[in-house]
Amino acid sequence: MPATYAHYRFGTQMLTGMPADVRRTAKRYRRLFDVGLQGPDLFFYYRPVVSTKIGRLGSKFHRQTGKEFFSRICRNLRLEPREEGLAYLYGALCHYALDAKCHPLIEKLSREGIANHIQIETAFDRFLMELDGKTDVRLAKHLTLTDPECGVVSRFYPGAEPKHVRESLKGMANIRRALELPEGPMRTMVTKTIGLGSRTFRDMAAGKELDAVCRELNQPLLERYRQAAKDFPEQVIQLGAHFAYNAPLGEEFTPIFG
């Protein structure tokens, strides 16, 4: 999972070039599209201090190929076509497109021992924000859904119920709010408290000293990001055709989320 900002940024950029009908649907159900941009990552935030069956769904679905994930979802949506589901579908496609391109490199860099997976993604998020000239990005507001919308999302993930989606999003939004606090004593206290329960969130809250360690990794990741953007229009076309008349998904959907 490139981190939250990278996925939000990528999806927002890709939305402008999507076919007009897809763009209208995404804008009409923008909350679902925005949450779709985070893909299965939301389950990592379900009661993260302990291992749970729901929390493990994040890893389970990241091990699926694009063909597995999107074929199953499209079969489901054809049985009960709903525009809300399509909005989430295309958000999730954005998530997959970026994950599938970036994760192999992130795993390689992590194995080389410079920094771990989460640290690399955290530093890359900050790099992108600096590239965009942003110092104060509020993403928690994009992580809220109504109860019926949680029901839409749960259809994408066998084993999850609407209540699980709701609690996962609440956890994700709370973590984001903590990470969005300005540098100072309050942020230090809150992030240290979060880090007590999870190494992952401790890495997400790492200070700017991490940026220097990961600086040399950002450019190769940015190249993967740009390649994902270049390949995305073809993925949109293929997914639309697959949903509409079960056209086969190509090799672009062979990689796993990672």
List PLM regions with ranges.
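N-terminal leader/auxiliary helical segments
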Residues: 1-93, 97-258
